[in-house]
């Protein structure tokens, strides 16, 4: 059964929800959070910190793009299930999709640990949202809150924070971007924040902002990523899991090449990953 409803992570209205092939799972497709699945087969989805999950999906989510169908989606099902299902997909044994496991440990490792890290990530993301230098940027409210790492929920009981406080958090971050000269334009929200047609901006990145982006890209902002190339199949699942755990315990983030959509070819996305990682592991 398909339906349109509100995204449980970011609050975007009118998103796609699907409950069909697995009665214990719910699949969502949101323009802000991308494609993701909650599974009730374990308690992983209950352990997710939504204050970290919303930015994670906004920055790292899988979305269909013009001229390209995205098969990947995040899932709270076990790593073993996701890996096995992906093997079947690649071997044409199912016609569905390619699940990529996510849990709170993965999200927490990704989440920025300092204010300056957040600022750098925001600037890089704003640049990714543009097609050309100097393009003006408008963000709907769910996108703004996720982009600015706004805490939507109180820590003790998951009660939602009032709209007034959400706006205050978001504008604090954007005001700093204006103050240090990284962006210019209109630093305000247009319309009632509770309305679906309200939006932030328009803003654009300044020459100083682009200079900072160049510095970050040269510094290699993916330095915590380890790209892993290995034989992929059910017989390597235990080894794969051991490699993932070892990389995580060392404080890094494992990216397996099969989790990067490439269809057997060196695509721009895959080539970009190879260029930007500090460590490439071949097994």
PLM regions and their residue ranges:
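Short amphipathic alpha-helical interface segments
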Residues: 43-162
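Cysteine-rich micro-motifs
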Residues: 23-37
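Conserved BB-loop
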Residues: 244-270
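Accessory beta->alpha helical hairpin/"wing" motif in late/C-terminal subdomains of nucleic-acid enzymes
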Residues: 39, 185-216
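Short amphipathic alpha-helical interaction segments
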Residues: 160-180
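Short cysteine-rich clusters marking metal-coordination/redox-active sites
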Residues: 7-11, 30-33
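Conserved beta-strand-loop-alpha-helix hinge of the TIR/SEFIR fold
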Residues: 273-283
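Cys/His-rich microdomains that often coordinate metals
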Residues: 14-15, 34-37, 200
